[in-house]
Structure formats: structure tokens, C-alpha cells
Amino acid sequence: MEQPEALSPTTNATASIDQRIPILHAVTSDDIILRSDFTDRVRRVKHAGGPRVAVHLRAARFSARYLFDLACQIAEVQTETGAWLIINDRADVALTSGARGLQLTSRSMAPADARRSAPHLAIGASVHSTDDAARAVSGGARWIVAGHVFETESHAGEKGRGTEFIGQLASEHAIPVIAIGGVRPEHVAGLRAAGAHGVAVIRGVWYASDAGAAVIDYLSAHGAPGGQ
């Protein structure tokens, strides 16, 4: 199986790395993965976004074998389109499926440990505070997904950290900051102005009637071209 191109950890490569990190991250859930049309939607998302989009395979209830089989299917679309497949939390699946990246959370191994175990993978980290971000960056994360920025259904009643949080992280760290949490296309310009490299969404893509069109909406709001 062809391995994805490694991203150099050296600081003088920051500019080129920043350009290669996708600007739209479409994050899944167990319920989304179980939909009968999930793989078809993945294909539409990846073709619409090309290398500017990443599909995050995030699941809590499935076995490693199930996720591995699913990831291998999605990795084939990655090769066709240049779009990224990123596995959340499960380093074993990321290592063996042909995924391009690994997204770490507070429950995962540290970024530094992941880099030693999987030097060819691009590694990001999910953060919820400035301290989280500092630890992730010092451990070698190549990007951070930060939130939640706006109120979401999964955090109902909890005030979002706001655009200012993204701006603070972007000013403190020379790696891409990806904003997550209730982000709609109309929020993208403001987040980008604050310093966000891109955005991560769940409902905005996977619950849209046309997932491919939703991708184009987000990319257009960012000012980036789509895929194929």
C-alpha cells in the first residue's frame, strides 16, 4: 500500500505545510457512519473539495476491524481526489489503512509519542484551551482543531469560546488553527480574518441535503477553489 507523503516537522517548512493542510475538515460521528449512503456522501465530499478537504473518521462504538475496513474504502477515494482521510484517536487504524493523518484528543497518546510511532502521518490535535494548544504544539502537532467556537446541539446551553479564542491561538502558534463548533458558511470569513486556517464541521456537511454542494459553500466562503 502506498504511504502518504510525510510532512516534515522542521520549523522552516511551516509555510509549505500550512498550505497543504486542508481548510475544510468534515468530521463524522457514529450515527453518520451508520447511514446507508455514508460512503457515497464521502465520495461526493472528496470530489467536491479535492485536496482542500479532509474527512475525519471519528467513531466511538465500532471495533478496530470495522473502522479499518471502512477506512480502507475511504482511502481509495483519497487517492482518486487528493482529499485527505484523517483517523481520529485510533493510531492503529491510521497506521494500517492508508490514511494521511491522525487526529488526537485528550484521550489519545501525546503528539510526540504518535510522531515516533507513525512518522509518515500528519498529526493534529483537538484543543479546548490555550494550555491544551501549548501542549499540543510543543508535542509536535502539525495543526490544532480548536473549539467549540459557537453554540452547538452537542453543547446546548454552553456558550462558545468565540472568534477571539481562535484569534488568540492563531497569534500564539505558528501552525494552522482549525475552528470547530457550530460553524456555518457565513462564519467563515470572520474566522479567517481572526487567523483561522480553516474550519471543521459535522452537521454543516453530513446533514446537508447535498453534501458536495455544502463543501463548495464552505470553500467559497473561505475563498478557496473546490476539487475536481
Located regions from the model:
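Conserved N-terminal beta1-alpha1 strand-loop-helix module at the mouth
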Residues: M1-L104, S108-P111, R116-R142, E158-R161, ...
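C-terminal binding/interaction regions
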Residues: A194
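Strongly charged, low-complexity linkers/loops
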Residues: G167-Q168, I180
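A short acidic, helix-capping loop that chelates divalent metal ions and anchors anionic groups
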Residues: A94, F150-H155
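Glycine-rich beta-strand-to-loop/alpha-helix junction loops that act as flexible
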Residues: A179-V183, V201-R203
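Residue-level signal for pocket-adjacent positions within structured domains
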Residues: E153, A200-V201
